Design a protein with these regions (language model features):
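Conserved N-terminal catalytic core of the sugar/cofactor nucleotidyltransferase
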Residues: 2-5, 13, 26-27, 31-95
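The conserved acidic donor/metal-binding loop of glycosyltransferases
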Residues: 98-100
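Conserved alpha/beta core of the MobA/IspD/sugar-nucleotide pyrophosphorylase nucleotidyltransferase superfamily
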Residues: 1-3, 154-155, 160-231
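Short, well-ordered alpha-helical microsegments
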Residues: 57, 103-104, 226
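A short acidic, often aromatic-flanked loop/helix-cap motif at beta-alpha or helix-coil junctions
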Residues: 72-76, 126-128, 218-221
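Conserved core of the sugar-phosphate nucleotidyltransferase
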Residues: 62, 104-185
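Short alpha-helical oligomerization interface
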Residues: 19-24
Length: 231
């Protein structure tokens, strides 16, 4: 198992904190976010880590492979992810946003999740959003499951709070078969490569999943049918 940290974007929501550093080097609890992420990944047994940089990417140094998205200011997360296409082809990879913190046990749970693509979401998201925003609905995105455990909505703004069953937290796993689905989608619609973020990518399919309770977080494996592209 390998890991890819997507750290190309400016992190504009962090405002002045990223004026002189990439968002993954902003400090929390006495050390950079990137250090927390590497610690969690290593704690879950992942030794091979790749960081895709962009904005101030020359500042990224550490016990990892560094790649650069030269179009970081014109593209979104999918383009940064595909900078590490060879890693995705070679083995299942944990994909991490660069502006989040998580424990090793969350990564470990994700490693065990079934499916070609798997991700974690937070069922207790509302407590955190209430602390961050006067109006949690202004930032929250849709995340709904049907009675059979299938994702029916993800990543849409402006939905009623009572309909949201969790929030995707920026940590997922993609297998080589999951990459095949992504590439099949892009073969049909190559213009999506530059503009899709991760939730928009996932929202372009309907898929089955299995739910795995993990304290505040749930892990679920996405059983993607590569023959059925719903766009």
């Amino acid at each position: 198992m390998k890991a890819i940290i997507l750290a190309a974007g400016r992190g504009s929501r962090l405002l002045s904190l990223t004026e002189d550093r990439p968002k993954c080097l902003v400090e929390a609890g006495g050390k950079p976010l990137l250090a927390w992420q590497i610690e969690a990944l290593r704690g879950a047994g992942i030794q091979d880590i790749l960081v895709v940089g962009g904005y101030l990417g020359h500042m990224l140094h550490g016990p990892f492979v560094r790649r650069h998205n030269p179009d970081w200011d014109k593209t979104n997360m999918l383009a940064s992810l595909l900078v590490a296409r060879d890693w995705l082809q070679a083995a299942p990879c944990v994909i991490s946003y660069a502006d989040i913190v998580y424990p090793a046990r969350a990564v470990a749970r994700l490693l065990d999740a079934p499916g070609e693509i798997a991700l974690l979401y937070d069922v207790n998201w509302r407590k955190l959003w209430t602390k961050r925003f006067d109006n949690p609905a202004s930032d929250a995105e849709s995340f709904t499951l049907d009675a059979g455990g299938n994702v029916t909505g993800i990543g849409q703004k402006g939905v009623p709070l009572e309909s949201i069953q969790g929030q995707y937290m920026g940590l997922l796993k993609i297998t080589p078969a999951g990459l095949e689905w992504i590439e099949a989608l892009l073969a049909r619609q190559p213009e999506l490569r530059a503009r899709l973020d991760m939730t928009a990518l996932l929202a372009r399919k309907k898929y089955g999943l299995k739910i795995d309770l993990f304290q505040e977080m749930y892990g679920f494996g996405l059983n993607i049918n590569l023959q059925r592209l719903l766009v």
